[in-house]
Amino acid sequence: MTDVSATTGRAGDRVSSTSSEVAVETTSQALTNGAAKEPLAAVTAEATATATVTATTTATVTATTTAATATMATAVISKQAKSECHSQSNNNQHVETAPSKQSSDSEASAPTTVSIPSANAKINSSSSGKTTATQQDVDEVARLFEEKPEAFEKWLTERAPPEALSRLHEFIESRKPHKRPSVTSDLFQQWMASPTVQQKSPRKLSNSSVHALPESRRHLMELDEGELFMELIRDVANELDIDVLCHKILVNVGLLTHADRGSLFLAKGTPNNRYLVAKLFDVTQTTALKDAVTRARAEEIIIPFGIGIAGMVAQTKQMINIKEAYKDARFNCEIDLKTGYTTNAILCMPICNYEGDIIGVAQIINKTNGCMEFDEHDVEIFRRYLTFCGIGIQNAQLFEMSVQEYRRNQILLNLARSIFEEQNNLECLVTKIMTEARELLKCERCSVFLVDLDCCEESHLEKIIEKPHQLQQQRTPRAIMSGDSFEEKQNMRNRFTVLFELGGENHAANVSRPSINDLSHSTLAQIAQFVATTGQTVNICDVQDWVREHNQIRAESEIDSTQAILCMPIVNAQKTVIGVAQLINKASGLPFTESDASIFEAFAIFCGLGIHNTQMYENACKLMAKQKVALECLSYHATASQDQTEKLAQDVIAEAEAYNLYSFTFTDFDLVDDDTCRAVLRMFMQCNLVSQFHIPYDVLCRWVLSVRKNYRPVKYHNWRHALNVAQTMFAMLKTGKMERFMTDLEILGLLVACLCHDLDHRGTNNAFQTKTESPLAILYTTSTMEHHHFDQCVMILNSEGNNIFQALSPEDYRSVMKTVESAILSTDLAMYFKKRNAFLELVENGEFDWQGEEKKDLLCGMMMTACDVSAIAKPWEVQHRVAKLVADEFFDQGDLEKLQLNTQPVAMMDRERKDELPKMQVGFIDVICLPLYRVLCDTFPWITPLYEGTLENRRNWQDLAEKVEMGLTWIDHDTIDKPVEEFAGCADEEIKDIEFTVTTLNCNQHGGSAGGGEDTHTPEHQRSSSRLSIKKTGALGKVVRSKLSKTLYNSMDGSKPKTSLKLLESHVSEDMDDKSPTSPSQPHSGSVGRMSASSSTSSAGTVDKSKKRSKLCALL
């Protein structure tokens, strides 16, 4: 052969078309001569005398043409090569390609050597010399190719010899990179590179084989062996049906090897228990697919690895070629005896995947062309064809697995859908799950054991109704735990309370409650008991061996019926075993596989989900039924009696003025309970709501009495508080002229909301409900108590004879209920803070039209809050008493927090800090009340009394707060008669550790004080008042205590500080004259001095009383 080196260069001057053609012909002649002189055997053996064609990677011949030219050239080459192959069908052609492994940079300079054998045997035999092209020739050809690609294209199509085209085509194909690594491509290249078995003449189909072919495949007889081989590979290449593929493999192998019949076995089982299953058995050239599949499924043949000829091939991965079968000890003649067929020669070969693992075994029997054995050529053809068949079988198995997985997913989706469709019927749900499992896994029977569902349900109900933070003995589900003792396990026979059984396809599901005796004498129950105890999956291949191994009693009736069992626990969300699922006997008689266990696990999970969901649904239904019963009982007991209703309906209702309903200073202290109800009726009458909305008078009376009845007797948030809130709303509507901004329906809703806004109040706030995780906090996550109040309001309205909205139209009913709900929820101060800024923005913008839905909602919310805290604007005597009630209720909650939650309550709920209440009241007024009333009275000036009353009470609370800061404790009485707590003690009690702290705020002198030389420049606004703080660590005498209290309050009422100090001096002096303190006082420097006197038994001497008095006066 001739080396042809082509290098790339930039295009130079164009040359004539004739010169290009001459150069092309020269190159072609060189290629032809080289091919003619190279024998085929030397090419296959890679002889050293092979000619090479050297070219750089970036300067191949194809690079000199355009894309269109390359495409046309390839087509022409393929056509010419095909024609040449037909004309030279008796010769073999092998292509050896040695691609460069260097980097792209080195490839630009390093030559690539390609050995191109010729396909023309005549040329090979006539070669006699060798011609080498010079570098100058190569450069000239390269330049002409770059300048005249059209001339090269014309030469290729018109004048190129077939052998040159063939060699050029092979060279181009060898230079193409693979798109991706391909197992099929690697195997194909390996097969193509392997040496062929020399045959003296081409192998043709025998006459018997030709006549056995169906009409659609008669054309195969016209093909030689190579073409037939490739055609039969294409026949199985795209087949994904495993049955059709195996049938084609056996038929095609029979054609290639002239075998009479064949069988194909597929490998199954676990790594520790591998066996072969006959996919198709004894398939001939004329056997139809349907008949072959039916026969194989009717009698499944299973061969363990290492048993028989096929088993040995599967185990050793080595082919076995037997010339005389009956002389081989591994041959089993039972099939021949049954069928009357005589087996002579057997060729059995393994089928492996790309990893070398056995996926099947193919076996062919007897030759049909007169030969008595399978020769070496048959073995090679068989091996090569099975290489491709292995790829096809694995692809078909993967496809079959994907189809099965799709079916399984569809079944699981149906099961998931069934969980929600059958959630009200556990029996139907479990039956459907068992039916799907039986059909998918092909087993004879299914059963499901359930564990003590009643106890599980009771435990769940107890958890739902469990009181927060209360120690309660928990009942756990009677599930079987692995840590139970042997005696406990023996006593757990009665744990299975329900048994679901499903037999064959025509059998209905059976649901039973087995007794202890039934469970004790049932092998299936014992296995289920074992699984429930251990919580492990059990796959039993031989039940009898398992019973013997575990010393269990086997029921005689189950000895012959049960062979293999797959048993799996059913667990709930807490990983507790709530049941056991069983699959009994595969239809094929084989044990359950790991794949079966994996699928069955999904069924067990869905079964557990379904059981749990059904139980929850049933529990929810029962709880709702109980709730309905409880609501009926509550409705009956919460509704006012008929006698009370008739009595109230017959009472004479006084005018509004008699109850002082129009005034913002209304108080309920003087009203009896019946009067409170009459006052409510009068408010409805004065607003003309009874006649406007056609409210039956007896229904209104019953509703008012029922609302009063549903308030708990707490200290503040009780019925009388609701009455005061409703009266304030009435006064704002009438006296405050707010009714001009409201419709009659909204007035009705606001009054109802005021009366119901604290229904069933427990004396605790929302924060307490959340901290204790009460059922109310679980039911309502925000505005907990307010939502409960509204629900109670709805409950009373829905009670028989209490619906005061019964005459409203559906639209009006929805509107008034929306008003009631929004108004009640607005009493939550958290809602007030959310709405306040929006309301203030509207007021600051000068809003006067409040008829929009959002603006009306804001206005009603502000009015509800103003009414709810309106006690802060009552006269001081009323406000003081109400504040005492609020404080007592808060202190009760604080005590509960200490007791139940073991936490320190906030200051306003801490009984130990009750003296700080005046200060906290001032803060409450400044933060909530005054801003609200100020903006309301600025916009609606008719409600100014609320703002003024709040200001007055703030001054009173501030005054009392200052007294507390002076060291005096707040009152512990219901009235203001004795505003300062009396110091307890007796008149004759000795003086003990009295500590005085005096702060002088009214100083006219600018020099030093008696206690020190400190300069006191007092601000102007502090010179008109004095502050006196007395801290008591011991006890004073009774006389000085009473005089001191009166003096302090007289001084705070307006007497001059100097007079007060003189009185204080005289009282202290009188008391000191009566006592004889023995320890001198030690005044501190500055404007604050301290003096202590204590009684002592020491006789160290007496103290000058006049000196002591002068020091105290100087300090004051």
From Swiss-Prot:
Residues 641-964 form the PDEase domain. Residues 15-28, 1085-1103 have a biased composition (Low complexity). A divalent metal cation 1 binds at H721, H757, D758, D868. The active site is at H717 (proton donor). The modification Cysteine methyl ester is found at C1113. Its cofactor is a divalent metal cation. It is an enzyme of class 3 (hydrolase). Its EC number is 3.1.4.35. InterPro entries: GAF (IPR003018), GAF-like_dom_sf (IPR029016), HD/PDEase_dom (IPR003607), PDEase (IPR023088), PDEase_catalytic_dom (IPR002073), PDEase_catalytic_dom_sf (IPR036971), PDEase_CS (IPR023174). Keywords: Cell membrane, cGMP, Hydrolase, Lipoprotein, Membrane, Metal-binding, Methylation, Prenylation, Repeat. Residues 86-136 have a biased composition (Polar residues). GO terms for biological process: cGMP metabolic process; signal transduction. The keyword Hydrolase applies. It is found in: Cell membrane. It is a lipid-anchor. The keyword Membrane applies. Its main location: membrane. One of its GO terms (cellular component) is membrane. Belongs to the cyclic nucleotide phosphodiesterase family. Interacts with PrBP. Has a role regulating cGMP transport in Malpighian tubule principal cells. This is cGMP-specific 3',5'-cyclic phosphodiesterase.
